[in-house]
Curated annotation (Swiss-Prot):
The lineage of its organism: Bacteria, Pseudomonadati, Pseudomonadota, Alphaproteobacteria, Hyphomonadales. The keyword Phosphoprotein does not apply. Belongs to the DNA mismatch repair MutS family. This is DNA mismatch repair protein MutS. Keywords: ATP-binding, DNA damage, DNA repair, DNA-binding, Nucleotide-binding.
């Protein structure tokens, strides 16, 4: 965003504009929402930019330096919607509020202006409001710090829930670490902006990157901020964090502190996630497998979208997190399977649980908004409803549960948290059925909850009844049946009569009682001492009622802060139950099965299916062809390297992807769409399937392909699972074949991992004969009356041909081009046979290079010694004769 700080000034600004310019100068990188009464106003370039993004009217207010000041504004009560559009447009917004009323300002002097101050800076990674946040997606704000030893630290928080993770990682794995989180914004030190790893991250991250001064990213500043935020004298209680981790924490907390503008930071103490206990997925693999983000950038068509059956927002976020960071812990995965199996075994119980969960609002975000002072009565009602719905779900679960579900049921049943149950029940009684969003609107405390409030309301409501009686009295007194008692914010309560009937009230004797206030085109307005006195009593009663409700609400907020810990545990249990139920529902719908975990690095699947492709085909009323796969990295029960050949469109890429997705699903704790699956856990999944240019970094399609292949060959271990499709296709045939051959050998001989390698280089199929742990498979295709039919079935052995010309015909190439391609193919296939000394390469040997005679060498030497620029015409002619003699051997 361009810097929109204070413009140059040659004239003295007004006090109001001086106040604006002073505040704006403190926030040059953000649009300034400047509160003026019922509007947030923007000025100068801020107004121009906001008007363009929001499609609102751009006007002007006064002059500065002899020029009109551009101005645009939005109503404060509808500000959240406008903020959401600005944030989506890549803006940061500083929200500047009035810190006092105009009446309070006047007490300081008749010319005093209202004091204002920035209360918050709204950025993509620091959102908390419902209207600004996608309910079913997480929102991670991350910060990175680097050490000089090839190590980096990643601090990640979610301001909307309070989660805070802090971990050190090898700097080379930064991409994997960043994409394992639903990143909304990344904070870096300005000193690190030109690091190659940061430049690379700019290429694959969709989240904005914010730079902060280098002094914010030091271990010393991190330690100081951690002590300040968590009220600690020493950091020992937080755990054994390194200096680079403290630096990352400091950078993150510094930014959160900046955006909250002095408000308390409400994060939980940092925890170190077990990065060694998760399945690592690099950026290229995550993109090609479309786990939670499609190639087009949306959610549709992703693995997450297809399997998601959650009914709560926290459950949806937890499911996404587990797909992004699958586990490597056998005990953790098994406990997740046990929960799914139990729910899957009782359809009635499963449905009853989901009915209760559907009525549970977003507890963790409601609690955080209340703790941040941004919540309202609706958040309080959401808290109560979520806690009580969870208790009902626990009651449905009953007894005889596997350990993980038993723990969830105990937490949700509130047997260990009686104070939480009591508070939730109190809220259910205290709040009206449909409370307003904001506490200042009032009317959210139910009748009968608070005696003092009921008394004030009785006075207020009784006075309103008196107003109705006064209207009848005044109509009778004046003889004007059209007389009405009305209210507005300027006049308060007043009497209004049609202008045509107002004359008697303007003359004695009625004028003695009715005081003229305002004459309008069609009406005249009056007041009376009696009405003014009653209006004062109503206003005071209204103010007292709102003040009492605010006091009750603040007491509730204090209780929420006291119970934040147990409420966070309950929110996590609700999400856990929702995810288990989601997996059970999806398994019931699709016939997905529980994987059998094996301590050995095997992958043995029967009837494996691609969940996303199958779902798409099902919508079209078509079936999916399931296939088997058997890999063993130790080579005891079969090949660890499978080389797959077959025509384009036959299903090779689908076969590869469904295998990798099965690993991710299984290690996330979900069941897998197959007849059966026996699986040894993987440490990493690699996918090199499909590629495109990366023009921003000057990389061609082939360069991208080679970078991704290099990453796999350099990083895959015997516990990894690798899929590669068409390695080498982006360059010349023989270069590509050589690269594919070398890559296949390296995977088999050096990496020794489970790998599926799809190729059109049929010469590579002979590798299975010389690599002991390799085997061939192919996709079936049949020709029928000159048409090609894909059977999508995987069979043992290599394919005999690629059917490229037939696929070109299916793609719609002109008939003449297809016919010509067929003719050329026949000639090529009838060419010379393979060279004996390169048995895997069907290449034609080149003719031997001609040898030079001594005479030729002498001619060349003479030419090399000549300087054409220095020769005279006579010397040049002599050289020609000499060369002729040399060529004859003279």
């Amino acid at each position: 965003m361009p810097d929109t700080a204070r413009p140059s000034a040659t004239t003295e600004p007004t006090p109001f504009m001086a106040q604006y310019l002073s505040i704006k100068a403190e926030h040059p990188g953000a649009l300034l929402f400047f509160r003026m009464g019922d509007f947030y106003e923007l000025f100068f370039q801020d107004a121009v930019e906001a008007a363009s993004i929001l499609d609102i009217t751009l006007t002007s207010r006064g002059e500065h330096d002899g020029k009109p000041i551009p101005m645009a504004g939005v109503p404060y009560h509808a500000a959240e919607g406008y903020l959401a559009r600005l944030i989506k447009g890549g803006c940061r917004v500083a929200v500047c509020e009035q810190m006092e009323t105009p009446a309070e300002a006047k007490k300081r002097g008749s010319k005093s202006i209202v004091q204002r101050g920035v209360v918050r800076i709204v950025t993509p990674g620091t959102l908390t409001e419902d209207a600004l946040l996608p309910a079913r997606q997480g929102q991670a704000l991350a910060a990175i710090a680097f050490s000089g030893a090839g190590e980096a630290a990643l601090a990640v928080c979610d301001v909307s829930t309070g989660a805070f993770d802090l971990t050190a990682i090898p700097a080379a794995r930064l991409g994997e670490a960043l994409l394992a989180w639903p990143l909304s914004e990344l904070v870096i030190s300005a000193d690190d902006a030109d690091r190659p790893l940061i430049l690379e991250a700019r290429g694959f991250l969709s989240a904005p990157i914010t730079e902060r001064p280098g002094r914010a990213a030091t271990a010393k500043s991190g330690e100081a901020l951690l002590k300040e935020v968590f009220g600690l004298a020493a950091l020992d209680s937080l755990g054994d964090f390194s200096r680079v981790e403290f630096a990352a924490a400091g950078l993150l907390l510094d930014y959160v502190k900046l955006t909250q503008a002095g408000a308390p930071i409400r994060l939980r103490a940092p925890r170190r996630p077990d990065t060694g206990g998760i399945l690592l997925i690099d950026p290229a693999t995550r993109a090609s497998l479309e786990i939670d983000r499609s190639i087009s950038g949306g959610r549709d068509g992703t693995l997450l979208a297809v399997i998601d059956r959650t009914v709560t927002a926290p459950g949806a976020r937890l499911l996404a997190a587990r797909l992004a960071r699958p586990s490597r812990s056998v005990s953790e995965i098994t406990s997740r399977y046990d929960a799914v199996s139990h729910l899957l075994g009782d359809a009635g119980q499963l449905e009853d649980v989901r009915v209760r969960l559907k009525s549970a609002p977003d507890l963790e975000r409601a609690v955080m908004r209340l703790n941040l002072g941004r919540g309202g009565p609706r958040d309080m009602a959401a808290l109560s409803k979520a806690v009580l719905s969870g208790a009902e779900a626990a009651g449905v679960l009953g007894r005889g549960l596997p350990p993980r579900l038993a723990e969830v049921a105990e937490t949700l049943g509130l047997s260990g948290a009686p104070s939480v149950r009591a508070f939730a029940e109190d809220l259910a009684r205290a709040l009206t059925e449909a409370p307003p969003m904001l506490a200042r609107d009032g009317g959210f405390i139910a009748q009968g909850w608070d005696v003092a409030l009921d008394e004030v309301r009785a006075l207020r409501d009784g006075s309103r009844r008196v107003i109705a009686e006064l209207q009848a009295k005044y109509a009778d007194q004046t003889g004007i049946n059209a007389l009405k008692v009305k209210f507005n914010n300027v006049l308060g309560y007043f009497i209004e009569v049609p202008a045509a009937k107002a004359d008697p009230m303007l003359r004695a004797p009625l004028s003695a009682d009715f005081i003229h206030r305002q004459t309008m085109a069609g009406a005249v307005r009056f007041s009376t001492h009696e009405l003014a006195d009653l209006a004062g009593r109503i206003g005071r009663a209204e103010d007292e009622a709102k003040a009492r409700e605010i006091a009750i609400f603040e007491a509730f907020c204090a209780k929420v802060e006291e119970l934040t810990g147990p409420l966070a545990v309950i929110a996590a249990a609700l999400a856990e139950l929702d995810v288990a139920a989601s997996h059970a529902v999806w398994a019931a719908e699709t016939g997905a099965v529980r994987p059998a975990l094996d301590p050995r690095p095997v992958f043995e699947a029967k009837g494996l299916r691609h969940p996303v492709v199958e779902a798409a085909l099902r919508k079209e009323g078509k079936g999916f062809t399931a296939n088997d796969l058997h890999l063993d990295a130790e080579g005891n029960e079969g090949a660890r390297f499978l080389l797959v050949t077959g025509p384009n469109m036959a299903g090779k890429s689908t076969y590869l992807r469904q295998s990798a997705l099965a690993v991710i699903l299984a290690q996330a704790g979900a069941f897998v769409p197959a007849a059966s699956l026996r699986l040894g856990l993987s440490d990493r999944v690699f996918s090199r399937v499909g590629a495109s240019d990366d023009l921003a970094r000057g990389r061609s399609t082939f360069m991208v392909e080679m970078v991704e292949t290099a990453a796999i060959l350099n990083q895959a271990t015997p516990e990894s699972f690798v899929i590669l499709d068409e390695v080498g296709r982006g360059t010349a045939t023989w270069d590509g074949l050589a690269i594919a051959w070398a890559a296949a050998e390296h995977l088999h001989d050096t990496n020794r991992c489970r790998a599926i390698f799809a190729t059109h280089y049929h010469e590579l199929t002979d590798l299975a004969a010389r690599m002991p742990a390799a085997s061939n498979a192919s996709l079936k295709a049949r020709e029928w009356k000159q048409d090609l039919i894909f059977l999508h079935e995987v069979q043992p052995g290599p394919a005999d041909r690629s059917y490229g010309v037939q696929v070109a015909k299916l793609a719609g190439l002109p008939r003449a081009a297809v016919a010509r391609a067929g003719q050329i193919l026949k000639k090529l296939e009838a060419g010379p046979s393979a060279s004996e000394n390169l048995p895997l390469f069907a290449m034609v040997a080149e003719d031997p290079a001609p040898e030079f005679s001594p005479e030729s060498s002498a001619v060349i030497e003479a030419l090399a010694a000549a300087d054409p620029d220095s020769l005279t015409p006579r010397e040049a002619l002599d050289l020609v004769y000499r060369l002729k003699d040399l060529s004859r051997g003279a």
